[in-house]
Curated annotation (Swiss-Prot):
Cofactor info, note text: Binds 2 [4Fe-4S] clusters. Binds 1 [4Fe-4S] cluster coordinated with 3 cysteines and an exchangeable S-adenosyl-L-methionine and 1 [4Fe-4S] cluster coordinated with 3 cysteines and the GTP-derived substrate.
GO MF entries: 4 iron, 4 sulfur cluster binding; cyclic pyranopterin monophosphate synthase activity; GTP 3',8'-cyclase activity; GTP binding; metal ion binding; S-adenosyl-L-methionine binding
Protein name: GTP 3',8-cyclase
Superkingdom classification of source: Bacteria
Organism: Haemophilus influenzae (strain PittEE)
Binding site for S-adenosyl-L-methionine: Y39, G80, S131, M202
Class of this enzyme: lyase
Residues noted as binding GTP in the record, renumbered to the chain: R26, R76, T107, K168, R270, L271, R272
UniProt pathway: Cofactor biosynthesis; molybdopterin biosynthesis
UniProt xrefs under CDD domains: Radical_SAM, Twitch_MoaA
Length: 337
C-alpha cells in the first residue's frame, strides 16, 4: 500500500506527481435533472436500467470525512440537479458538520431556491452557484427547455434575503445565442453583488456538432473587460478555475472559465466523485476509480484514503481538449460538470 504523506497545517495530503495540492471536492449526489439544457441533456434525464443507485447519506458522509482528513477544505454538491434529492438538506447538514470542511457550496439550476434557500443557509451551505444562461426569458426557455426564468430570478433575490452576501451565476457561453447579452449581464451586476461567470462551451462525445456551431473563446470577453478597466484578481487555494475580474464602478464581478486556454490545468486543485461513487481525476478523463465498496463503515477509512491517494498518482498533467480528445465523457451531467 502506498504511503500517504503527513498533513501539515494549511496543506493537503492530496498531492499529485506534479506537486499540485487538492483542497476542493466536487461531489455529485444525483445524475437526475429536471432541466433539458441544450449543451448538456437536450433530451432530458434518461435513467439507465439496472444501474447502481446513487450514494446514500451514510456513504456520502464517510466519503466527505475521508477527504476532509486528507486536507479537503471545500466540497461542492453538484448533479444533475442536487436539490432534487429528498435528503438534500440532510446531506448538506452532515457535510457542514465535518471537521475541516470550511466551505460547502452547491451548484443548482435554481428551481427550488425561492422556496428552500433560507434552509440551505441554516444548515451550513456557505455559497451558491446558480445557472442562468440568459436574461431574456424566451432565450432562457429555449436553452433550458423549461419556462422557469422568473422563479430562478426570484430565487436569487431570496438568497440575498437569506443572508448570502454574494451569489455566483453560471452561464455557458454560446456564439450567436447568449454572447449577444454580455452588455446586459454587465448592467445586471452593476449594483448587485453577483459574480457572473461565463463558461466556455466544452466538447463532449455526444455534442461535437453543437460544439462546432456554438463554441466561442472566452478570451473575446476577457479582451473586452481589460479594455474597459476591469482588473484580474488573484486566486485563493480553494478557488475554482474561473479568472475573476473586478471594476471599481461595479458591485458585481465577472468570472471566465476557459478550459482551452494554455496552462488551464496548471492550477488544478479539485477532484470529482460521481453520484455512484467513482473518483474522477479530471472532467475529461478516465472511466473512474471505484470507491463505493470502501464507504460502508468508518473502519475502512484508512484503506479508502490509500486508494484515493494511489489513484491521484495517475493524474495527467493536463487534459487533451486542444487536440479534440474529450476522454470517455458523453456529457457532463454524470459527474457534475
Amino acid at each position: 500500500m502506498q504511503s500517504i504523506p503527513i498533513k501539515n497545517v494549511g496543506e493537503s495530503r492530496l498531492v499529485d506527481p506534479f506537486q499540485r495540492q487538492y483542497y476542493y471536492l466536487r461531489l455529485s449526489i444525483t445524475d437526475q435533472c429536471n432541466f433539458r439544457c441544450t449543451y448538456c441533456l437536450p433530451d432530458g434525464y434518461q435513467p439507465e436500467a439496472n444501474k447502481p443507485s446513487f450514494l446514500t447519506l451514510k456513504e456520502i458522509t464517510h466519503l466527505a470525512q475521508a477527504f476532509a482528513e486528507m486536507g479537503t477544505e471545500k466540497i461542492r454538491l453538484t448533479g444533475g440537479e442536487p436539490t432534487l434529492r429528498k435528503d438534500f438538506i440532510s446531506i448538506a447538514e452532515s457535510i457542514a458538520n465535518i471537521e475541516g470542511i470550511r466551505q460547502l457550496a452547491v451548484t443548482t439550476n435554481g428551481y427550488r431556491m425561492a422556496k428552500d434557500v433560507a434552509d440551505w443557509k441554516k444548515v451550513g451551505i456557505t455559497s451558491i452557484n446558480v445557472s442562468v444562461d440568459s436574461l431574456d426569458p424566451k432565450m432562457f426557455h429555449q436553452i433550458t427547455g423549461i419556462n422557469k426564468f422568473d422563479d430562478v430570478m426570484r430565487g436569487i433575490d431570496r438568497a440575498f434575503e437569506a443572508g448570502y452576501n454574494k451569489v455566483k451565476v453560471n452561464s455557458v457561453l454560446m456564439k450567436n445565442l447568449n454572447d449577444k447579452e454580455f452588455e446586459q449581464f454587465l448592467v445586471w451586476v452593476k449594483d448587485r453583488p453577483i459574480q457572473m461567470r461565463f463558461i466556455e462551451l466544452m466538447q463532449t462525445g455526444e455534442m461535437d456538432s453543437f460544439f462546432d456551431r456554438y463554441h466561442l473563446s472566452g478570451q473575446v470577453l476577457a479582451d473586452k473587460l481589460l479594455k474597459n478597466g476591469w482588473i484580474l484578481q488573484h486566486k485563493s487555494h480553494t478557488d475554482g478555475p474561473a479568472k475573476v475580474f473586478t471594476h471599481s464602478d461595479y458591485a458585481g464581478e465577472i468570472g471566465l472559465i476557459m478550459p482551452y486556454e494554455k496552462n488551464f490545468c496548471a492550477s488544478c486543485n479539485r477532484l470529482r466523485v460521481s453520484a455512484k461513487g467513482k473518483l474522477h481525476l479530471c472532467l475529461f478523463g478516465e472511466e473512474g476509480i471505484e470507491l463505493r465498496d470502501l464507504l460502508q463503515s468508518h473502519e475502512q477509512q484508512a484503506i479508502l484514503q490509500a486508494r484515493i491517494f494511489a489513484a491521484l498518482q495517475g493524474k495527467r498533467e493536463h487534459h487533451y481538449l486542444h487536440i479534440g480528445d474529450t476522454g470517455v465523457r458523453n456529457h457532463l451531467a454524470s459527474i457534475g460538470g
